[in-house]
Amino acid sequence: MTKPQTLIIATNNANKAREFSAMLAPYDITIKTLADFPNIPEIKENGITFEENATKKATVVVEATGLPAIADDSGLMVKALHGDPGVFSARYAGDHDDAANNAKLLANLGGVPEAERTATFHTTLVALKPSGEKLVVNGELAGRILIAPRGDNGFGYDPLFWSSKFQKSLAELTPAQKNQISHRGAALRQLMTKFDEWWAKA
């Protein structure tokens, strides 16, 4: 069964879209994003789980376009903060502002020693077809939160997230290095192993 020619990544985040495009480059798929469909209504991410938010995004996009879509919801879970910011990661400081989110995270971890600043990045990906056939996969990356930002690459909480594998923050890695270990990369690799079977279903 051939794979679809066009897939919509349900995001307006250009950084996230680039990560998906890089991971999907080996496949013969045309990638589009919400930027290509300005008439799609705003998607409210008000679910209480990553899967609920991702499913909501994918459903809105599929219904509006008639094309298959992949949506993700990702977040940072910090053990010392009882799993926060979690599903609220993108709007932790009140709106979608990386600098403000990072500042709030550092403030809330004030006084917590480095050894106890363990954290996990989580991604849930939902692939949805117009037929309603749904595939859900997850990916995670364990690490810890630094005391101060490091690096100029990446986005979101990347400057604060320490990779033990590379002994660098995610923002100090090249895009290729980040894709090797990232939670989104792990979820996407898992998705692609199941992609053909998912697409072959009615």
Curated annotation (Swiss-Prot):
Residues the entry annotates as binding Mg(2+): 73
| Residues that hold substrate according to the record | 11-16, 74, 155-158, 178, 183-184
Query: What is one term from the GO cellular component aspect held by the record?
Result: cytosol
**Enzyme class, UniProt record, top EC level:** hydrolase
UniProt cofactor(s): Mg(2+)
One matching Pfam family is Ham1p_like
**Catalytic function, reaction form:** XTP + H2O = XMP + diphosphate + H(+); dITP + H2O = dIMP + diphosphate + H(+); ITP + H2O = IMP + diphosphate + H(+)
Q: Which residues cross the membrane?
A: none
Catalytic positions are 73 (proton acceptor)
Instruction: Please name the GO terms that the record assigns under molecular function.
Output: dITP diphosphatase activity; ITP diphosphatase activity; metal ion binding; nucleotide binding; ribonucleoside triphosphate phosphatase activity; XTP diphosphatase activity
Provide the E.C. number(s) assigned to this enzyme: 3.6.1.66
Q: What InterPro entries is this protein classified in? A: dITP/XTP_pyrophosphatase, ITPase-like_fam, RdgB/HAM1
Keywords from UniProt, A to Z, are: Hydrolase, Magnesium, Metal-binding, Nucleotide metabolism, Nucleotide-binding
How is the cofactor bound, in the record's words? Binds 1 Mg(2+) ion per subunit.
Please list the GO biological process terms of this entry. Answer: nucleotide metabolic process; purine nucleoside triphosphate catabolic process
Question: Could you tell me which Gene3D superfamilies the record lists for this protein?
Answer: 3.90.950.10
Which CDD domains does the annotation name? HAM1
Q: Briefly state the protein's biological role.
A: Pyrophosphatase that catalyzes the hydrolysis of nucleoside triphosphates to their monophosphate derivatives, with a high preference for the non-canonical purine nucleotides XTP (xanthosine triphosphate), dITP (deoxyinosine triphosphate) and ITP. Seems to function as a house-cleaning enzyme that removes non-canonical purine nucleotides from the nucleotide pool, thus preventing their incorporation into DNA/RNA and avoiding chromosomal lesions.
Question: Into which family does the record put it?
Answer: Belongs to the HAM1 NTPase family.
Description of how the protein assembles with itself and partners: Homodimer.
NCBIfam families, alphabetically? PRK14822.1 (NF011397), RdgB/HAM1 family non-canonical purine NTP pyrophosphatase (TIGR00042)
Q: What is this protein called?
A: dITP/XTP pyrophosphatase
